[in-house]
Amino acid sequence: MAKKVVGYIKLQVKAGQANPSPPVGPALGQRGLNIMEFCKAFNAATQKLEPGLPVPVIITAYSDRTFTFITKSTPATTLLKKAAGISSGSKRPNTEKVGKVTRKQLEEIAKAKEPDLTAADLDAAVRTIAGSARSMGLVVEG
């Protein structure tokens, strides 16, 4: 018989830096899950990623207090800010531009995000990422 799913927990945790402090501890503690077990498993799963990049994770909690988790790719906005060398997006993206990204940078981000995007091909994925860049106040070159 399959385990009964109690709930899903969505978090953003920095790669390789999961620890029992908030937001991880309280979120898992509410469901009675083993916090240290998750931290060790998550840190092992994200050790190949650049330390400190936020990684979205979806944790499935079961009735017998076990869990499974799926990691997603780093959010596009974080990758765009890193590529443009800025700390935050524009408060008024239509009038106030805060940085520039090239088509090549957008292609690299699209390749990294490809498993999580619903785009049909690389060009469509690049257009999606370019739209995110423009909505942050970045100028897309190329």
From Swiss-Prot:
One or more lysine residues are methylated. GO terms for cellular component: cytosolic large ribosomal subunit. InterPro entries: Ribosomal_uL11 (IPR000911), Ribosomal_uL11_bac-typ (IPR006519), Ribosomal_uL11_C (IPR020783), Ribosomal_uL11_C_sf (IPR036769), Ribosomal_uL11_CS (IPR020785), Ribosomal_uL11_N (IPR020784), Ribosomal_uL11_N_sf (IPR036796). SUPFAM superfamilies: Ribosomal L11/L12e N-terminal domain, Ribosomal protein L11, C-terminal domain. GO terms for biological process: translation. Keywords: Methylation, Ribonucleoprotein, Ribosomal protein, RNA-binding, rRNA-binding. GO terms for molecular function: large ribosomal subunit rRNA binding; structural constituent of ribosome. It holds the Pfam family Ribosomal_L11. Part of the ribosomal stalk of the 50S ribosomal subunit. Interacts with L10 and the large rRNA to form the base of the stalk. L10 forms an elongated spine to which L12 dimers bind in a sequential fashion forming a multimeric L10(L12)X complex. Forms part of the ribosomal stalk which helps the ribosome interact with GTP-bound translation factors. PANTHER family: 60S RIBOSOMAL PROTEIN L12, LARGE RIBOSOMAL SUBUNIT PROTEIN UL11M. Belongs to the universal ribosomal protein uL11 family. This is Large ribosomal subunit protein uL11. It comes from Stenotrophomonas maltophilia (strain K279a). The gene is rplK.
